[in-house]
C-alpha cells in the first residue's frame, strides 16, 4: 500500500519526549520525513535551514512557547501550514493561535488518530480535503449555537479578553477596566499585525441586548482580516479606520444584528510613532504627555445605514487612552520599547 505522506517533511515541535516520539513514529509510518524540536528555540534554528511542508506545534513549552514561535515565523513572512496539538484549556491561547494563522487546533489527549489523519491531510492537501461549503456549514452551526446559548456566548467572550499587560509588536501594553463583574460591558481586543504595528478596538456590548455579545464575537473573528485587507489596498502605509468601521457597520447589518454598537478602533505603528483613533459612539480622551485630546464620539454603529466618522492621528511613542460608555470605563496604556 502506498504511503500517503512520502516526500513530505514534517517538523514536530513538542517538549514531551514520549508524545514527540509517538508523533515521530506515526508520521514515519505514513511515509513522511520528520524533523524534531523540543521547543520554539530549537524549531527556529531548524527553520533557518529548511522549510517543512507542515509544522506540528505544542503551545506550552520551555524557553519559547508555541505562540511566540508562531509570532516569529509569521513576522518574517513564513506561511508554513501549522497544526497545533496542545493540552491548553485557555481559550485565549487557542484564539491567538488561530489569529496567527494556524490551520487547526487539536486538544490533547489525542485519542482519535483518524481525526488527526484528516486534519493533517487537510493541511497538506487543502484543495482536496477542504470544502468551502462544509466550512460555511460548520460556521453557521457554531453561530447558531452561540445564538441559542447566550450564557455560553458571554462566557466565551469573557475568556477571550486579553491579558491586562503584555508586550506586543515591541510595545508594552496594559489596561485597567471598571465594569460590573457579573456581565459583559466594554470588550477590548488587541492584536499584532506585524512586528511593527498593532490594532485594537473597544466595543460596548450593553446597548443591543444579547446581540452585543454576538457582535463582539463576530468582530473578534473578522477584525484582523478586515484590517489586513485595508492595509493591503492602501498606497500609503497607514489605514483609513473610518472606512473599516463602515465595513463593520455593513457586516453587522448583514448578520441581522439590530441594536446600537458603540465602538472605538485604534491602530499604532511603532516605527512611525503614529497612533490613529476613530470612535463611533464611545467617549474617549487621549493623553500623549504633551497633548490631551478629546476624541469626537460620533454615532454608534447600527444606528444609521452609513457610519460618518472622523479619524484622529497623533505622533507619539507613549500614550494613554481613557474610554467610557454605558458599559463602564477602560484605560488603555502603551509605550514603545
UniProtKB/Swiss-Prot annotation:
Effects seen without this gene: Mutants exhibit nearly constitutively high levels of RpoS and are impaired in the post-transcriptional growth phase-related and osmotic regulation of RpoS. In exponentially growing cells, mutants exhibit significantly reduced levels of polyadenylation and increased stability of specific mRNAs.
GO CC annotation, single: protein-DNA complex
Induction section of the entry: Expression is induced during stationary phase by RpoS.
Documented effect of changing residue 216 to T: Resistant to IraP, IraD and IraM
Signal peptide segment: none
Single GO term (MF): phosphorelay response regulator activity
Response regulatory domain segment(s): 9-123
InterPro entries linked to this entry: Bact_response_regulator (IPR050595), CheY-like_superfamily (IPR011006), PPM-type-like_dom_sf (IPR036457), RssB (IPR028616), Sig_transdc_resp-reg_receiver (IPR001789)
Alphabetized Gene3D superfamilies for the sequence: 3.40.50.2300, PPM-type phosphatase domain (3.60.40.10)
Keyword terms, alphabetized: Phosphoprotein, Stress response
4-aspartylphosphate: residues carrying this PTM: 58
UniProt PTM comment: Phosphorylated. Phosphorylation stimulates the interaction with RpoS and, therefore, the proteolysis of RpoS.
SUPFAM superfamilies xrefs: CheY-like
CDD domains: REC
Activity regulation info: Under certain stress conditions, activity is inhibited by the anti-adapter proteins IraP, IraD and IraM. IraP is involved in response to phosphate stavation, IraD in response to DNA damage and IraM in response to magnesium starvation. IraD and IraM interact with inactive RssB, blocking its ability to interact with RpoS. IraP may mimic RpoS in its interaction with RssB and directly competing with RpoS for binding to RssB.
GO biological process terms, semicolon-separated: negative regulation of DNA-templated transcription; positive regulation of proteolysis; protein destabilization; regulation of DNA-templated transcription
Domain notes: Contains an N-terminal receiver domain and a C-terminal output domain that are both required for binding to RpoS. IraP and IraD interact with the N-terminal domain. IraM interacts with the C-terminal domain and, more weakly, the N-terminal domain.
Family: Belongs to the RssB family.
Function comment: Regulates the turnover of the sigma S factor (RpoS) by promoting its proteolysis in exponentially growing cells. Acts by binding and delivering RpoS to the ClpXP protease. RssB is not co-degraded with RpoS, but is released from the complex and can initiate a new cycle of RpoS recognition and degradation. In stationary phase, could also act as an anti-sigma factor and reduce the ability of RpoS to activate gene expression. Is also involved in the regulation of the mRNA polyadenylation pathway during stationary phase, probably by maintaining the association of PcnB with the degradosome.
Subunit structure as annotated in this protein's UniProt entry: Binds to RpoS with a stoichiometry of 1:1. Interacts with the anti-adapter proteins IraP, IraD and IraM.
Name recorded for this polypeptide: Regulator of RpoS
Protein's gene: rssB
Amino acid at each position: 500500500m502506498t504511503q500517503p505522506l512520502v516526500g513530505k517533511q514534517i517538523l514536530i515541535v513538542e517538549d514531551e519526549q514520549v508524545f514527540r516520539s509517538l508523533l515521530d513514529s506515526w508520521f514515519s509510518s505514513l511515509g513522511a520525513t520528520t524533523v524534531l524540536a523540543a521547543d520554539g528555540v530549537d524549531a527556529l534554528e531548524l527553520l533557518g535551514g529548511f522549510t517543512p511542508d507542515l509544522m506540528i506545534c505544542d503551545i506550552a513549552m520551555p524557553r519559547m512557547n508555541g505562540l511566540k514561535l508562531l509570532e516569529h515565523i509569521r513576522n518574517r513572512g513564513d506561511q508554513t501550514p501549522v497544526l497545533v496539538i496542545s493540552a491548553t484549556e485557555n481559550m485565549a491561547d487557542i484564539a491567538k493561535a488561530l489569529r496567527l494563522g494556524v490551520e487547526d487546533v487539536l486538544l490533547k489527549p489525542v485519542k482519535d488518530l483518524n481525526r488527526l489523519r484528516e486534519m493533517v491531510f487537510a493541511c497538506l492537501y487543502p484543495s482536496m480535503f477542504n470544502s468551502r461549503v462544509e466550512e460555511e456549514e460548520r460556521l453557521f452551526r457554531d453561530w447558531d449555537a452561540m445564538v441559542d446559548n447566550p450564557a455560553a456566548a458571554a462566557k466565551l467572550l469573557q475568556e477571550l479578553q486579553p491579558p491586562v499587560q503584555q508586550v506586543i509588536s515591541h510595545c508594552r501594553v496594559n489596561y485597567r477596566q471598571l465594569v460590573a463583574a457579573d456581565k459583559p460591558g466594554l470588550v477590548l481586543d488587541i492584536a499584532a499585525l506585524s512586528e511593527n504595528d498593532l490594532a485594537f478596538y473597544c466595543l460596548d456590548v450593553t446597548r443591543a441586548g444579547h446581540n452585543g455579545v454576538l457582535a463582539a464575537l463576530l468582530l473578534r473573528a473578522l477584525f484582523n482580516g478586515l484590517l489586513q485587507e485595508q492595509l493591503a489596498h492602501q498606497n500609503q502605509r497607514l489605514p483609513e479606520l473610518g472606512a473599516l468601521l463602515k465595513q463593520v457597520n455593513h457586516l453587522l447589518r448583514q448578520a441581522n444584528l439590530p441594536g446600537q454598537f458603540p465602538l472605538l478602533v485604534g491602530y499604532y505603528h511603532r516605527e512611525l510613532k503614529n497612533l490613529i483613533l476613530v470612535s463611533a459612539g464611545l467617549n474617549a480622551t487621549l493623553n500623549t504627555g504633551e497633548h490631551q485630546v478629546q476624541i469626537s464620539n460620533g454615532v454608534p454603529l447600527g444606528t444609521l445605514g452609513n457610519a460618518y466618522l472622523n479619524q484622529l492621528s497623533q505622533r507619539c511613542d507613549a500614550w494613554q487612552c481613557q474610554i467610557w460608555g454605558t458599559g463602564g470605563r477602560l484605560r488603555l496604556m502603551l509605550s514603545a520599547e
